[in-house]
Amino acid sequence: MARSLKKGPFVADHLLRKVEKLNAKGDKQVIKTWSRASTILPQMIGHTIAVHNGRQHVPVYVTEQMVGHKLGEFAPTRTFRGHTKDKKAGR
């Protein structure tokens, strides 16, 4: 289910404060966050946000097409190494 329009999008307060502070300075630096559930807002466009994937921080450069999506969508948590080869096929 989608979030109620009355409530608005979820963005972690600490993340929003960091983005607004960098926008006020006009500075571009990597913002490290663990908040994968935060929604990408138009204020974040042009920033690089390092999103935690459970093991490391994955740098995500925010573009206009990402607005409205969650940060966690762009930092995959699982690494797929391929299916195992069938042992009978080798004979």
Swiss-Prot record:
Q: Which GO terms describe its cellular component?
A: cytoplasm; small ribosomal subunit
A Pfam family per the record? Ribosomal_S19
* Keyword terms of this UniProt record: Ribonucleoprotein, Ribosomal protein, RNA-binding, rRNA-binding
* Source species, domain of life: Bacteria
Q: SUPFAM superfamilies this protein is in?
A: Ribosomal protein S19
Q: Which InterPro entries match?
A: Ribosomal_uS19 (IPR002222), Ribosomal_uS19_bac-type (IPR005732), Ribosomal_uS19_CS (IPR020934), Ribosomal_uS19_SF (IPR023575)
Give GO terms for biological process: ribosomal small subunit assembly; translation
A GO MF label:
structural constituent of ribosome
Q: Does the keyword Transmembrane helix apply?
A: no
Which family is annotated? Belongs to the universal ribosomal protein uS19 family.
Question: What job does the chain carry out?
Answer: Protein S19 forms a complex with S13 that binds strongly to the 16S ribosomal RNA.
Q: What is this protein called?
A: Small ribosomal subunit protein uS19
